[in-house]
Amino acid sequence: MNQYTLYIEIHNIVFDTALEGCWMGYKLPREFYFGFSTAGFQHEMGMPGSEYMSDWYIWVHDLENIMAGIVSGDLPENGPGYWELYQVDHDIAQRIGMNTARIGIEWARIFPEPTVDINVDIDEDDEGIKRVILDEKHLAELDERADKKAVERYRQILSDLRERGFTIILNLYHWPLPLWVHDPIAVRKQGVDKAPAGWVDKRTIIEFTKYTGYISWKLGDLVDMWSTMNEPNVVWTTGYLLVKTGFPPGYLDQKSALIARKNLLEAHARAYDVVKEFSKKPVGVIYSIPDIQPLKDDDKDAVMLYEQSNVYYFFDALVKGVFDDTTRDDLKGRLDWVGINYYSRAVITKRYVSGDRYIPFVVPGYGHNCSPNGRSLDNRPTSDLGWEIYPEGLYNVLVEIWRRYGLPIIITENGIADERDQWRSWFLVSHIYQAYRALSDGVALKGYLHWNLIDNYEWSSGFKMRFGLVYVDYQTKKRYLRPSAFVFREIASRKEIPNELEHLVNPPTL
């Protein structure tokens, strides 16, 4: 062995020994999706001519709602203007390492006029609507009724993403309904039996299926994955149970909530069937799932009741066909993937109503029920919206949904209302770390979509709640990257949490 060879061997030994104590980062699969999600009502409006009528549009413009503080008084037509500025936002997304976009289509834009007179064949029995049949004649009639300019603009948006090499997830429903389907002001004044009642009316299942069939026929060539709807559980709970949240129709009625829940479930199944007639791409649903925890050990049965009613009811039906006390083959197997929207946890206890009877009760001071910009009862920081930052809950949700259903999962929303960008970098890294943990434990997790790329119109809260990696000046429509956008770029472009971001994996010292 000569002197040079000896030097090389000693150098390698020293180098390898040094690496043994060096943290090399949390690596994600090269094919992992990193991207953003949009919702038409929250992003599209803001430039002249981009407005459109829907139940949400009249809801946030209603003077009674504004005066009562039910909605903010901010108006969506002053929004970020994605309808015209989509290429600007796609440029930014590309520059910060994104490769996937979940785009929402607005039913009310496509069909501002009713489609109820386009008669289709329906299979229905006492259990529900089992099938909605569309043929070429129906599609031609729908094509005559549709707003062609809106269809063409969506094609331009999707084509621009396609040309950039993005994977496209098309979501067909993210809350707003055509006014002829749902008039929330009329429902509030007259009741669900005397006004267009949205998801409380089973005819909405039929109209929704027509719309989804039409979109899959017109735009399916540009789509990689489908989602029928976003957070149906939020629709039936906020609209008919948690009526102080500011969501339409604000009509307190448990019976209506249960009817809407059933109709949304059937609407997904019928939409799944019709999309599959035109597309071989996977069809899923996007669901809001907090990490549901007991306050005390004896609250575990209350947690199980809460989970079954709000989460597993939907998935048990679509995966296993289990519906209440029966089995329905027309629901079974209508799910190819699961989108999970995760923001925080929910801590549950029992609230006794009489004798041994109780209902699950969400405990204030944890999860989504905290004071803004403060601390939870667990001494964790909270967002501008009052949501506790609880990253480890994401791991729990991913593992449990994978264990129960064994379907591919995408994190379709995860983010924080943080105007000052105080917590967002830590929020981002700590949650992606929990995604890494789930992947390492065998969960078929395919991607992470951040909510949001840009600031957006946050429903009844208006413009005050800013979720964007990118700040939007709503007056000028200019975009400005926040520091957290560069953190996202490091992770997304390298497909790992690099060692220089290791300090953001764990909660900060409070």
Question: Residue spans of the language-model regions?
Answer:
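Intrinsic-disorder-associated, low-complexity terminal segments enriched in Asp/Asn/His/Tyr and depleted
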Residues: 2-7, 11-12
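Non-catalytic scaffold segments within catalytic domains of secreted glycoside hydrolases
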Residues: 14-90, 94-96, 104, 108-510
